[in-house]
């Protein structure tokens, strides 16, 4: 691929057997540090799920080493160019599972999963009338961007998705089901779970939103907004043909694609808001969070009690 920027961000996963995740994680961290990569990699007995950043040379060495390991034969790396690192540190952590579903009877995607649809086929399937499109991500990811007509499950974490489906099964009955997520890993299990639940026509977007946005044929069409990513970039573009902002400012409802975390560390909720509203509302999602003694915005900007009181008065006056 033609390279114009000095850094890359790699996104990848693979369901494969790793006998001793703890030992592998420790050795892999050492290896990543030796290459000076930064990122977050999860390791489980069922495989690996990672995203990391480094220079072109560093990421090439990493991909070469992974491809030379028979456990990761056929692994696919999704590559984004970047101006610098997308992470502050390097973490490699063992986990009970790669994506947290916590099912009593776990899903093995090698044994049961939905049909894979390449971007063009997924694009065509979305336009069919008897199709229902389910976003398998969290609510804050959906709020920043999603496929036109996609259903937003009212969930804050992936493990809540099966219960939501059971409670809303009338939406899916008799329909062709399409599922999608950022890179594909969540849908491998989620679509498999749907098949096991008895849904007959279940498909998943192969390679996820990231692959869809890079596909030269579809060019991200039918996607509105941006794609939430779990690194310092926060959002990446998908639709190369038109950019429609779907995110709404938490405070005013105006179009917005800027995420911040609520300044109250006990809340830490992700909220969309402009720089102006961040300052006006002390980066807090509610009055309770604004007056929290641990409000990070207040501490960071060394605001006095008088300044905080004035800000609260201004908010009250504007209601």
From Swiss-Prot:
Pfam families linked to this entry:
Rhodanese, Rhodanese_C, UPF0176_N
Q: Which UniProt keywords apply?
A: Oxidoreductase, tRNA processing
| Listed GO biological process terms | tRNA modification
Q: Which GO terms describe its molecular function?
A: oxidoreductase activity, acting on paired donors, with incorporation or reduction of molecular oxygen
Please name the SMART domains in this protein's record: RHOD
Q: What NCBIfam families does the record tag this protein with?
A: PRK00142.1-3 (NF001135)
Q: Which PANTHER family match?
A: RHODANESE-LIKE DOMAIN-CONTAINING PROTEIN 7-RELATED, THIOSULFATE SULFURTRANSFERASE/RHODANESE-LIKE DOMAIN-CONTAINING PROTEIN 2
Q: What is this protein called?
A: tRNA uridine(34) hydroxylase
Give the species this sequence originates from: Bacillus anthracis
From the broadest rank down, the organism's phylogenetic lineage runs: Bacteria, Bacillati, Bacillota, Bacilli, Bacillales
Gene expressing this chain: trhO
């Amino acid at each position: 691929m033609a390279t114009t920027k000095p850094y890359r961000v790699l996104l990848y996963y693979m369901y494969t057997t790793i006998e001793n995740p703890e030992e592998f994680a420790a050795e892999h961290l050492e290896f990543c540090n030796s290459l000076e990569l930064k990122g977050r990699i999860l390791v489980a007995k069922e495989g690996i799920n990672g995203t990391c950043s480094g220079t072109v040379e560093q990421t090439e060495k990493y991909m070469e080493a992974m491809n030379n390991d028979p456990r990761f034969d056929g692994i696919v790396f999704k590559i984004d160019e970047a101006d610098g690192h997308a992470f502050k540190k390097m973490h490699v952590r063992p986990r009970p599972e790669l994506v947290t579903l916590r099912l009593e009877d776990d899903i093995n995607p090698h044994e049961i999963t939905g049909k894979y649809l390449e971007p063009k086929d997924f694009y065509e399937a979305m336009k069919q009338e008897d199709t229902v499109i389910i976003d398998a991500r969290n609510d804050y990811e959906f709020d920043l961007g999603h496929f036109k007509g996609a259903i937003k499950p009212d969930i804050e974490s992936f493990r809540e998705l099966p219960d939501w489906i059971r409670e809303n099964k009338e939406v899916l009955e008799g329909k062709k089901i399409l599922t999608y997520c950022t890179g594909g890993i969540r849908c491998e299990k989620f679509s498999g779970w749907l098949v096991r639940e008895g849904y007959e026509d279940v498909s998943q977007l192969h390679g996820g939103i990231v692959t869809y946005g890079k596909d030269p044929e579809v060019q991200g069409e039918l996607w509105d907004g941006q794609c939430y990513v779990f690194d310092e970039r926060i959002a990446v573009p998908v639709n190369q043909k038109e950019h429609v902002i779907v995110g709404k400012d938490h405070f005013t409802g105006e179009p917005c694609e800027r995420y911040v975390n609520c300044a109250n560390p006990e809340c830490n909720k992700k909220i969309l808001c402009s720089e102006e509203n961040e300052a006006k509302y002390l980066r807090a999602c509610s009055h309770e969070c604004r007056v929290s003694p641990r409000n990070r915005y207040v501490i960071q900007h060394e605001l006095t009690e008088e300044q905080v009181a004035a800000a609260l008065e201004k908010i009250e006056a504007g209601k």
